[in-house]
């Protein structure tokens, strides 16, 4: 997915002068030491008239848009305390920037409504969950008792008994996908990976890392996998097992693949005992269980693994995730590590031991009913946003089981960056999370409609047609508007 969010430090760069400069609200004497925000001038082609409205992303170029310099303390710094004062000023400025950016956070699926003040006392400890969560190692400063409690909770949600699952808390959602696909590859070493074109980029990263043959499957207009195309491509490779990534909420459109139809397609195609399914539930994997009449993601079905992100719907302040697979598969990956006096079947080595505690804390505070209320609120507010957009004459789409509202990409990239909207081609989206209130949506909608009126007021250009992206019924361009 092509993102449109600027480096947060750029905003700070606007609030501080590069060398011995002064940030907004900062006393000159507090910053007049060697604490710098380094921000190089913009390339000439980005300035002046005729510059492109969309930023060009150039790979292979180490461009430092902004940075806080790291410099050696002065010899007398312990006596003067200037260094500490300068760092405190930079951190205060950065915090104000975070507060401001959080007010305009809509395009990425992070729940910013949390309070973990009670856990501050644990920040004094280096908590590291090395190795297998279920095996005690020589390292004693860990949180595996919290980790296993969290894993048991997710195993219950996905209907897998304690003695039948294995899992761990990952460092991010991508790691869950890397692990799930790796397990599939170990179960079927010559298997082909199938994933819809709208799968998260980490799925295709896994294919490159593991040097797997990968087949991209077409999608429906909703973003859901096209099982007719899936069937055609399966039959072209019927001599090799299938490893399938099933999306429980695609990145851009929030589409949920039809798991039951995927399984039916595999079985009818002659792959009954020759497939492994990994479910990427980064965001909606934890929302779907609380949606009435939604299809179940369950290990009672022939799936191999499920992963979710912990920093998205749950609202953990640091990136993390949960990966659950069947115990019968894990020995193919596991190996003894004498250094740890444990076994290891994870992707990473050291793992954040604080994350399981944050997850455990939230799961205990909210419980099943709490999450159910938050899911209902998100879906209700997402429908509100979609309806308001359409009332304003802006094409929009909302999938049935989703809180991701897809709509016409704003013409002004400054507006995109201000609201941190995720964009792809002619579309952008807002992901309605528990922290997104009706008031915030109204604020966004009012600003969008006001700005949009100026973008198209002279008639020199028209809003883009979204029919190919969201379907004719959801497009409100001059051609499809009824």
From Swiss-Prot:
It catalyses: L-serine + H(+) = ethanolamine + CO2. The modification N6-(pyridoxal phosphate)lysine is found at residue 312. It is an enzyme of class 4 (lyase). Substrate binds at residue 200. Its cofactor is pyridoxal 5'-phosphate. PANTHER family: PTHR46101, SERINE DECARBOXYLASE. Belongs to the group II decarboxylase family. Catalyzes the biosynthesis of ethanolamine from serine. Decarboxylation of free serine is the major source of ethanolamine production in plants and ethanolamine metabolism is crucial for the synthesis of choline, phosphatidylethanolamine (PE) and phosphatidylcholine (PC), and thus for plant growth. NCBIfam families: PRK02769.1 (NF002748). This is Serine decarboxylase 1. It comes from Oryza sativa subsp. japonica. The gene is SDC1.
């Amino acid at each position: 997915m092509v993102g449109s969010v600027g480096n947060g430090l750029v905003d700070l760069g606007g609030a501080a002068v590069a060398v011995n400069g002064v940030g907004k609200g900062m006393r000159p004497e507090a910053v007049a030491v060697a604490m710098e925000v380094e921000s190089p001038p913009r390339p000439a082609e980005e300035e002046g008239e005729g510059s492109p409205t969309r930023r060009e992303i150039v790979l292979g170029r180490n461009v430092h848009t902004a940075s806080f310099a790291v410099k050696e303390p002065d010899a007398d710094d312990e006596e003067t305390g200037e260094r500490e004062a300068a760092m405190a000023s930079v951190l205060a400025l950065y915090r104000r920037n975070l507060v401001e950016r959080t007010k305009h956070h809509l395009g990425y699926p992070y729940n910013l409504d949390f309070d973990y003040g009670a856990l501050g006392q644990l920040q004094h400890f280096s908590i590291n969950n090395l190795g297998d969560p279920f095996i005690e190692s020589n390292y004693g400063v860990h949180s595996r008792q919290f980790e296993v409690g969290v894993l048991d909770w997710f195993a219950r949600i996905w209907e897998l008994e304690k003695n039948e699952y294995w899992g761990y808390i990952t460092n991010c959602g991508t790691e869950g996908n890397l692990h799930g696909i790796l397990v599939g590859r170990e179960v079927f070493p010559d298997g082909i990976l199938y994933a819809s074109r709208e799968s998260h980029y980490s799925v295709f990263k896994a294919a490159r890392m593991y040097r797997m043959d990968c087949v991209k499957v077409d999608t429906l207009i909703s973003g859901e996998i096209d099982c007719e195309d899936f069937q055609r491509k399966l039959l072209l490779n019927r001599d090799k097992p299938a490893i399938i990534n099933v999306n429980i909420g695609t990145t851009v459109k929030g589409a949920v693949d039809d798991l039951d139809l995927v399984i039916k397609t595999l079985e009818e195609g002659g792959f009954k005992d020759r497939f492994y399914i990994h479910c990427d539930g980064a965001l909606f994997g934890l929302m779907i269980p609380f949606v009435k009449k939604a299809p179940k993601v369950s290990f009672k079905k022939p799936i191999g693994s499920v992963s979710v992100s912990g920093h998205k719907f749950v609202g953990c302040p640091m990136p993390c995730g949960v990966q659950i697979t069947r115990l019968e598969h894990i020995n193919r990956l596991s190996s003894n590590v004498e250094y740890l006096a444990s076994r290891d079947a994870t992707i990473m080595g050291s793992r954040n031991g604080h994350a399981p505690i944050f997850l455990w804390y939230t799961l205990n505070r909210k419980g099943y009913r709490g999450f159910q209320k938050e899911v209902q609120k998100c879906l209700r507010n997402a429908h509100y946003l979609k309806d308001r957009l359409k009332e304003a004459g802006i094409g929009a789409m909302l999938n049935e089981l989703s809180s991701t509202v897809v709509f016409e990409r704003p013409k002004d990239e400054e507006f995109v960056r201000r609201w941190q909207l995720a964009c792809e081609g002619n579309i952008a989206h807002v992901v309605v999370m528990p922290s997104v209130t009706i008031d915030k949506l109204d604020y966004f909608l009012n600003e969008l409609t006001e700005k949009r009126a100026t973008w198209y007021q002279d008639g020199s250009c028209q809003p883009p047609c979204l029919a190919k992206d969201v379907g004719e019924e959801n497009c409100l361009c001059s051609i499809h508007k009824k």
